[in-house]
Amino acid sequence: METLSQDSLLECQICFNYYSPRRRPKLLDCKHTCCSVCLQQMRTSQKDVRCPWCRGITKLPPGFSVSQLPDDPEVLAVIAIPHTSEHTPVFIKLPSNGCYMLPLPISKERTLLPGDMGCRLLPGSQQKSLTVVTIPAEQQPLQGGAPQEAVEEEPDRRGVAKSSTWSGVCTVILVACVLVFLLGIVLHNMSCISKRFTVISCG
């Protein structure tokens, strides 16, 4: 398999969605990888799966589904898709240091508390841990109650949207008035030109 960046290793190169328990990384006979959802869509239109990159054919016997294709072990080692019976994964994107997905075990009986050491990023000797940091309540916009500043900003945002809509309407009306005025001038000039050639009797 060609060298890929960590981003492209973690996402299907057809639909650009991250691999997950629903979109498992499936390995084709040609050693290219794409998600099970994309492969299933390709399979519905043809009997065999044709690789979108090298056009290599992966033969699937009758009654054999895409989900029975092998998972790509390299991708699984990085993303560590858990079995759904073990725990519910939480995926955190950390762009500052290149770590993109971090499955944390969440127990229904016990929540992850500040200071708890959480989990795995890479297998084997490359395991890393995460210290959960407490964020002050006023800086937690995703909590059930929105911070007071966000509540105060909401009417301001609506006001900005209304004022920008109103200014757009006013601009259209102003342009229409200018066009009508110019049309009036042109029509007036045309009527004056036709009057120059009328015969005036002197009698």
Curated annotation (Swiss-Prot):
Alphabetized UniProt keyword annotations: Apoptosis, Lysosome, Membrane, Metal-binding, Transferase, Transmembrane, Transmembrane helix, Ubl conjugation, Ubl conjugation pathway, Zinc, Zinc-finger
User: Could you say which residue ranges form the zinc fingers (RING-type)?
Assistant: 12-55
For this protein, the record's Gene3D superfamilies field holds: Zinc/RING finger domain, C3HC4 (zinc finger) (3.30.40.10)
PROSITE patterns assigned: ZF_RING_2 (PS50089)
Pathway field of the UniProt record reads: Protein modification; protein ubiquitination
User: In what way does this protein cross or attach to the membrane?
Assistant: Single-pass membrane protein
The regions listed as transmembrane in this protein's record are: 167-187
Per the record, the domain of life is: Eukaryota
Q: Which reaction does it catalyse?
A: S-ubiquitinyl-[E2 ubiquitin-conjugating enzyme]-L-cysteine + [acceptor protein]-L-lysine = [E2 ubiquitin-conjugating enzyme]-L-cysteine + N(6)-ubiquitinyl-[acceptor protein]-L-lysine
Which residues lie within the region annotated Necessary for interaction with RRAGA? 106-165
Region annotation (Disordered) maps to 140-159
- Keyword check for Nucleotide-binding, yes or no: no
Q: Tell me which GO cellular component terms the UniProt record holds.
A: lysosomal membrane; lysosome; organelle membrane
Q: Could you say which EC number(s) this protein's record lists?
A: 2.3.2.27
- Is Zinc-finger among the key words of this record? yes
Q: Which GO terms describe its biological process?
A: apoptotic process; cellular response to amino acid starvation; negative regulation of TORC1 signaling; positive regulation of autophagy; protein K48-linked ubiquitination; protein K63-linked ubiquitination; protein monoubiquitination
Its post-translational modification remark reads: Ubiquitinated. Autoubiquitinated in vitro, leading to its degradation by the proteasome.
Q: Name one GO molecular function term.
A: ubiquitin protein ligase activity
PANTHER family given in the database record: E3 UBIQUITIN-PROTEIN LIGASE RNF152, TRIPARTITE MOTIF-CONTAINING PROTEIN 2-LIKE PROTEIN
The record's subunit annotation is: Interacts with RRAGA (inactive GDP-bound form); stimulated by amino acid starvation. Interacts with SEC16A.
Function of the molecule: E3 ubiquitin-protein ligase that acts as a negative regulator of mTORC1 signaling by mediating ubiquitination of RagA/RRAGA and RHEB. Catalyzes 'Lys-63'-linked polyubiquitination of RagA/RRAGA in response to amino acid starvation, thereby regulating mTORC1 signaling. Also mediates monoubiquitination of RHEB, promoting its association with the TSC-TBC complex and subsequent inhibition. Also mediates 'Lys-48'-linked polyubiquitination of target proteins and their subsequent targeting to the proteasome for degradation. Induces apoptosis when overexpressed.
The record's comment on protein family reads: Belongs to the RNF152 family.
> What is the protein name for this chain?
E3 ubiquitin-protein ligase RNF152
